[in-house]
Amino acid sequence: MSDNRGLAVVTGGARGIGEAIVDELVAAGYRVAVVDVNAKALAKTAEREAFRAGLVIPVELSITDRTAVERELGALAASHGAIQALVNNAGMTLPATFLDQTDEDWNRIIAVNLTGTFIMAQVAARQMVEQRSGVIVNISSVSAHGVRTGPAAYAAAKAGVEGLSRLMAVQLGPFGVRVNTVVVGTTATPWLLSRKSDEELETMRSTTLTGSIGEPADIAKTVAFLCSPSAKHITGQMVSVSGGQWMP
């Protein structure tokens, strides 16, 4: 394990890609706060060896609740020091075409994917600006670029995350805070594999230049690199981890 790099926060960290990101950041030397709204999934975090070693901290939290975010991130800083890295991975979507998208679903998807990212980033960035260092990685999707079909709200939210990330990089750079975006393609999460047939998965493979579907570890290793000292001169960038589904 690398030298202690301080505290990292990963939203949506109890499952899928988020869980893989937590593993990579722990291996890199971070103590990681695992933020998730799913209490059942979060409870499994407390069963892990890293929890027993004091390297992961489960935090049940809705990222759309600013008051709760300010309270919990403040408590984490008081107990473990200011946040050194934030990964905004939490997200959700609902099945619908553009013509069928309801206002209710639009608002819910935008709230989690875009507003929640904004709230978490702003609260964490205030700590980072004070200490004049930090890194934020926001997770986007190839859906923002029209690569695959899906709800209009999800595509709009992820496009918003990318624009927000660029603005953050410009405004936070003078304070020593780096901001980058990882654009995720089709990834073999447990959620995806449980819902798609072999035929559907094969169709998804055919949309990549590599002829393969990504693994959560592919995303996690990229995020860990961007959070590392090796990436100290990288900010304001969008990194596509999609097998070539989308190329910047």
Residues of each region from the PLM?
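Alpha-helical segment proximal to the catalytic Tyr-Lys
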Residues: R126, V170-P174, K232
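Substrate-binding pocket helix/loop in short-chain dehydrogenase/reductase
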Residues: T97-F98, D105-I110, L192, E200-M204
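Residue(s) in the substrate-gating loop at a strand-loop-helix junction
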Residues: S141
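Short C-terminal tail/terminal secondary-structure segment
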Residues: S2, H145-G146, A224, T235-P248
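Active-site helix of classical SDR
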Residues: A121, A157-G160, S165
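C-terminal helical subdomain
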Residues: T181, T203-I234, V241-G243
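Active-site loop immediately N-terminal to the catalytic Tyr-X3-Lys motif
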Residues: L99, G146-A152, P174-F175, G211, ...
